[in-house]
UniProtKB/Swiss-Prot annotation:
Residues reported to bind substrate: R168, W175, D176, N212, R221, S222, Q223, R292, D293, E294, G324, E525
GO molecular function: alpha,alpha-trehalase activity
Protein name: Cytoplasmic trehalase
Pfam families: Trehalase
PROSITE patterns: TREHALASE_1, TREHALASE_2
Keywords, alphabetical: Cytoplasm, Glycosidase, Hydrolase
Main location (coarse class): cytoplasm
Length: 549
């Protein structure tokens, strides 16, 4: 990837100097609360909270040895293994035998750990099924039932059934689940919607936020905050009344705004940045600054080539994972080098749009419950965020939303994340019209809309298209009256997925859509995954709206 040619169709937007020299960071507010920042889970009746230690914390040098030795092709495999005995006993045994001449690390791991189950090998698709039938038959395959928690496993037990994306992802994921839920609702699976609603509310109650996924190594970060959108979906589909989730929405908001009151202009703490004019906007963050358990070796290698303190790089890699866009030119100072990642220095347009939706949802539900003061407070917060986004993230010259580099005080790259303000109703009609023109000319292809217009070798860039981006673009443009563009994206995406399904009899995580011939999407840290939860969800919903392609 480092030698790959970067195609930049808009050089004016890429005037970013490569700066790999480390400087002391006066902008980050250091508070005592950052020590041991991860919340301790509570006990609830009927389901004991899971042990929150990560595999890296628990197995120490054994964990590093296994990951460094590449015993498994995928770095996620070992963190997902479950020990056959007390981890302390395993560690003691390892320390006793590791220096023996005939020590075999692979055999040691096989003797002391249960490997993760591989579910995908159990399912064979029927080529005679239509796309709709295929998706409806996949829901049981992607469903995981609540189970007694395996002692010392990284999997966090949940009280109800849930849907997983598929492939290597054998746990539920926060923002993936919203787009999966769209399809569940269309398939009439209100039972699963109720289960997943209960699970996410349970995680907020017990961990103070919804983690990236239900693994111990995901507890230190969240993902794009879409619980307010889930609550809206629950209300629309008669699954649960929105009022019952008001406290959960407030708790999630407190997580994202933690430390805001202590900040002065040009200072940041965790997820919050106070801008030069005193307004508050948010960034992605992870409370840990170590290599990710699930991508340990990849992170170590990336940090080696960064020219920066490793812990700083690890934090930015983790924050990039929290964004859901792992990885993309959006987070890179030099779009050809993952080692130049600076996620925590960008104010993302999509994150702040989702938080606008959260603030608006709290205000709306508070109004339904007659809580006038709370309603007024959160309407003011939503209005202030909308104004700040317009000041800092709206590029009036080009008619687009862009991320904002708050450390350099300049706009960053244009990507499909720019459509999220339309999806949540934050843009005005003039902004929506101008953005539609930019999307038509810069991101739209015969196969759907591209994640970005930059070819970097990262998976959230050109030539890839992703289901959640299609859905938000379709609905966002239609909400502002541009049915023509919304319908074009919808039919293009349905054609892409159906054409690939007819040839390969499967749905996948992402698609190569740059040239009108649907192919498997590439890039990223891991092989392409089949399944696939949010692709199934979005396509099933679109079939309900547009019919089978």
């Amino acid at each position: 990837m480092l030698n790959q040619k970067i195609q930049n169709p808009n050089p004016d937007e890429l005037m970013i100097e490569v700066d790999l020299c480390y400087e002391l960071d006066p902008y980050e507010l250091k508070l005592d609360e950052m020590i041991e920042a991860e919340p301790e889970p509570e006990m609830i009746e009927g389901l004991p909270a899971s042990d929150a230690l990560t595999p890296a914390d628990r197995y120490l040098e054994l964990f590093e040895h296994v990951q460094s030795a590449k015993i498994f092709p995928d770095s996620k495999t070992f963190p997902d293994c479950a020990p056959k005995m007390d981890p302390l006993d395993i560690l003691i045994r390892y320390r006793k035998v590791r220096r023996h001449r005939d020590f075999d690390l692979r055999k040691f791991v096989e003797n002391h750990f249960w490997l993760p189950e591989v579910y995908s090998s159990e399912y064979v698709s029927d080529p005679q099924n239509s796309l709709k039938e295929h998706i409806d038959q996949l829901w049981p395959v992607l469903t995981r039932e609540p189970q007694d928690h395996i002692p010392w496993s990284s999997l966090l037990a949940l009280p109800q059934s849930y849907i997983v994306p598929g492939g290597r992802f054998s746990e539920t994921y926060y923002w993936d689940s919203y787009f999966t839920m769209l399809g569940l609702a269309e398939s009439g699976r209100e039972d699963l919607l109720k289960c997943m609603a209960d699970n996410f509310a349970w995680m907020i109650e017990n961990y103070g936020h919804i983690p990236n996924g239900n693994r111990t190594y995901y507890l230190s970060r969240s993902q794009p905050p879409v619980f307010a959108l889930m609550v809206e979906l629950f209300e629309e589909d008669g699954v649960r009344g929105a009022r019952r989730y008001l406290d959960h929405l407030k708790m999630e908001y407190a997580f994202w705004m933690d430390g805001a009151e202590s900040l002065i202009p040009n200072q940041a703490y965790r997820h919050v940045v106070r801008m030069p004019d005193g307004s508050l906007l948010n960034r992605y963050w992870d409370d840990r600054d170590t290599p990710r358990d699930e991508s340990w070796l990849e992170d170590v290698e990336t940090a080696k080539h960064s020219g920066r303190p490793p812990n700083e790089v690890y934090r930015d890699l983790r924050a990039g994972a929290a964004s859901g866009w792992d990885y993309s030119s959006r987070w890179l100072r030099d779009t050809g080098r993952l080692a130049s990642i600076r996620t925590t220095q960008f104010i993302p347009i999509d994150l702040n749009a989702f938080l606008f939706k959260l603030e608006s949802a709290i205000a709306n539900i508070s109004a339904l419950k007659g809580e006038k003061e709370t309603e007024a407070l959160f309407r003011q917060k939503a209005s202030a965020r909308r104004d700040a986004v317009k000041r800092y993230l709206w590029d009036d010259e080009n008619g687009i939303y862009r991320d904002y580099d708050w450390r350099r005080e300049q706009l960053a790259l244009f990507s499909a994340a720019a459509i999220v303000p339309l999806y949540v109703g934050m843009a005005n009609h003039e902004q929506a019209d101008r953005l539609a023109n930019a999307v038509r000319s810069r991101l739209l292809t015969p196969g759907g809309i591209l994640a970005s217009e930059y070819e970097t070798g990262e998976q959230w860039d050109k030539p890839n298209g992703w289901a959640p981006l299609q859905w938000m673009a379709i609905q966002g443009f239609k909400m502002y009256g541009d049915d023509l563009l919304g319908d074009e994206i919808a039919r293009s995406w349905l054609k892409t997925v159906n054409q690939f399904y007819l040839e390969q009899h499967k749905l996948i995580e992402k698609y190569h859509i740059a040239d009108g011939v649907p192919r498997e999407g590439g890039g990223g840290e891991y092989p392409l995954q089949d399944g696939f939860g949010w692709t199934n969800g979005v396509v099933r919903r679109l079939i309900g709206l547009y019919g089978e392609p």
